[in-house]
């Protein structure tokens, strides 16, 4: 992991890991941590160093948004316009602008969340999101199918990467902030980086396997 290319940032997935494990990674220089449970992330935010950049990487429920808006650096999993609008509403109340990634469904499993490419195109073309002044769409996120088939993983990541280029050219050509492509986890981040990822979400390779 120390060999990461310059443009790739590491999100250390610290969910279910104790503060001590995060502090150890922090002392080693890691500053970006990813959590998928609102309550857990908020508790950690309150008790850990304030220069940590907290990324929310789970499935976000609309009624929980208000708890993370004051401090979250990036929300990776925006999978509906409704969710985006609610983040905007809560961010406006908090006097903040929240960075968000649109989550695309690229895997074969039905269990994964996200827009289809067509749904995402429709939402962006409709243009209502331009009225939301308290969110900033900074890029896209996706999860590949959990499989040992490297070719399939590569194909899924490449499809998201080319969709990113399409979206950037069509709707965010002048937006410098639209530059993040969050894809790749412990088992497939090499393929993700090769396909153009700028954010990899890695847990077990840093913290070891979790004890549930």
Regions found by a protein language model. Name each.
Residues 198-199:
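Divalent-metal-activated hydrolytic enzyme cores
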Residues 202-212:
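Short C-terminal tail/terminal secondary-structure segment
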């Amino acid at each position: 992991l120390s060999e990461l290319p310059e443009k790739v940032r590491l999100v250390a997935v610290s969910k279910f890991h104790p503060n001590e494990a995060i502090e150890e990674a922090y002392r080693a220089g890691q500053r970006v941590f990813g959590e998928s449970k609102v309550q857990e992330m908020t508790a950690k935010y309150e008790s850990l160093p304030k220069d940590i950049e907290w990324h929310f990487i789970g499935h976000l429920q609309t009624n929980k948004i208000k708890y993370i808006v004051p401090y979250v650096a990036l929300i990776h999993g925006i999978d509906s316009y409704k969710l985006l609008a609610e983040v905007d509403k809560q961010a406006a109340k908090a006097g903040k602008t929240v960075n968000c990634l649109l989550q695309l469904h690229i895997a074969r499993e039905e269990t994964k969340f996200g827009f289809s490419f067509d749904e995402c195109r429709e939402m962006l073309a409709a243009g209502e999101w331009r009225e939301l002044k308290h969110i900033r769409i900074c890029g896209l996120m996706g999860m590949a199918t959990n499989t040992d088939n490297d070719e399939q993983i590569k194909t899924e990541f490449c499809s998201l990467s080319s969709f990113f280029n399409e979206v950037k050219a069509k709707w965010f050509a002048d937006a410098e902030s639209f530059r993040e492509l969050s894809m790749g986890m412990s088992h497939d981040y090499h393929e993700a980086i090769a396909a153009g990822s700028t954010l990899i979400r890695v847990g077990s390779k840093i913290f070891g396997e979790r004890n549930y």
